[in-house]
A protein has these predicted regions:
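Membrane-embedded transmembrane alpha-helical bundles that form the catalytic cores
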Residues: 1-174
Length: 174
C-alpha cells in the first residue's frame, strides 16, 4: 500500500514464504529453540532484507513514480529511453521489494527459533521462464504444485491433461 492509502489487498500479504505442515512439526520440536547462532542469522537476514526494501526498493520505486506518476512526466509525455528506464526501475523495485520482504520474514522466523525455506533465488538470472518460475516465490509455486497441480494428475495423465492442469495453476496464480 502507498503512504496515502489505508487500503490493503491480497498482494500485501503474499510475499512471505508460505509454510505448510513442515512448520507445524517445528512447533512441537523442543530442539528447535532459538540459539545464539540462529538469532544472529535471523538478525542479519532481517537487516539485509530491510535494507533491500527501504533503501533499494523504495528509492528505485520513487524513480518509477516520478516517471509515470501524476506529478511526474506521465505516460503520455514520456520518451522511449525514459520509458525503458521506468520499466527497468519498476522491475528492480519488484525484485528488491520481494527479496527484502522474504528475507525479513525468514529473519524474524529465525529470531523466533524457526527455520523457513528460502523463498527467492535470484530469478532475474534465470535462463528460461520455467527456471524463473522456480526461483521467484519458491514456496508459492511449491504450494500450487503440491495442492493443485499434482492432485489434478500433474503430468501423469497425458499431454492434453498436463497442459490443462498447467493452465489451471497459471490461472489460479493470477
Amino acid at each position: 500500500p502507498t503512504a496515502e492509502s489505508t487500503q490493503y489487498g491480497k498482494q500485501d500479504y503474499t510475499v512471505v514464504p508460505i509454510e505448510g505442515l513442515d512448520l507445524a512439526d517445528q512447533l512441537h520440536d523442543g530442539q528447535n529453540r532459538c540459539t545464539l547462532a540462529k538469532a544472529q542469522r535471523g538478525a542479519e537476514l532481517f537487516v539485509f532484507g530491510l535494507a533491500k526494501k527501504v533503501i533499494l526498493a523504495d528509492s528505485i520505486g520513487a524513480l518509477w513514480t516520478d516517471i509515470i506518476g501524476a506529478g511526474g512526466v506521465g505516460l503520455a509525455n514520456v520518451s522511449t529511453p525514459l520509458a525503458w528506464l521506468g520499466i527497468i526501475a519498476y522491475s528492480l523495485q519488484l525484485y528488491f521489494d520481494f527479496a527484502g520482504y522474504s528475507e525479513m520474514s525468514n529473519g524474524l522466523a529465525a529470531l523466533l527459533g524457526f527455520d523457513c525455506p528460502a523463498n527467492f533465488n535470484l530469478p532475474y538470472i534465470s535462463g528460461s521462464i520455467t527456471e524463473f518460475w522456480r526461483r521467484w516465490h519458491i514456496t508459492l509455486s511449491g504450494w500450487f504444485r503440491d495442492y493443485i497441480y499434482i492432485p489434478l494428475g500433474g503430468n501423469r495423465k497425458g499431454a492434453a491433461r498436463q497442459l490443462f492442469n498447467m493452465f489451471l495453476v497459471w490461472a489460479a496464480t493470477g
